Regions:
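Short helix- or helix-capping micro-motifs
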Residues: 99-104
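Transmembrane-helix motifs of polytopic, lipid-linked glycan transferases
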Residues: 69-91
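Membrane-interface alpha helices of multi-pass inner-membrane proteins
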Residues: 110-111, 145-165
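Extracytoplasmic loop-helix module adjacent to an early transmembrane segment
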Residues: 1-37
């Protein structure tokens, strides 16, 4: 993306400033990074800038190639969709075809989970949050690892679209108490 390329260029030209752009608190106006920050259209929007940061992390490995970065976004999104599929498959294996269709093959899920969007990241995080919640709450295995994955996924969703987390948490709570 445009913004992630600027962060990537900063990492190449001036690594400390690039790291500030990547990991620093962008809401504190640091004059040392102004040279790069003013070029990033969404620098002032923390939710959009989070996506730029993720894309910039991927850009490190893809040398800022848009196509390769988009493939990494799609792979991350698919991993979350697959985790969601596995979760529901464990619950109802007899309905595996319907579960696969609903988690993996619905066109809108396929579309929104395949580009460099906020939705791509939140879809993946939602899948991983569901998977880790089920594994910790019902299977009671790998609780530390899955707890960390769940907290990380919740943090990602909270950083990008708080309302998704606020509407999903009550569903998890109801699921937890009804399944017991």
């Amino acid at each position: 993306t445009h913004g992630s390329r600027i962060v990537w260029e900063a990492l190449i030209d001036e690594p400390l400033k690039g790291l500030k752009l990547l990991f620093g608190d962008h809401e504190k106006h640091d004059p040392s990074i102004y040279k790069y920050a003013w070029k990033i259209w969404f620098f002032g929007d923390s939710q959009s800038y989070f996506v730029i940061r993720v894309a910039a992390l991927f850009d490190i490995f893809t040398f800022s190639s848009y196509s390769a970065t988009a493939i990494l976004f799609a792979a991350f999104s698919f991993s979350g969709s697959w985790a969601l599929f596995l979760t529901f498959y464990k619950i109802a294996p007899d309905f595996h075809k319907w579960i696969a269709f609903s988690c993996l093959f619905i066109p809108s899920v396929f579309f929104w989970g395949s580009g460099i969007f906020k939705d791509t990241i939140t879809l993946a995080a939602l899948g991983w949050l569901t998977y880790s919640f089920y594994t910790v709450s019902f299977e009671r295995r790998n609780m530390v690892t899955n707890g960390i994955i769940g907290l990380f996924a919740a943090w990602i969703i909270f950083s990008i679209k708080k309302y998704i987390l606020l509407s999903f948490l009550p569903a998890l709570i109801v699921w937890f108490f009804l399944a017991r």
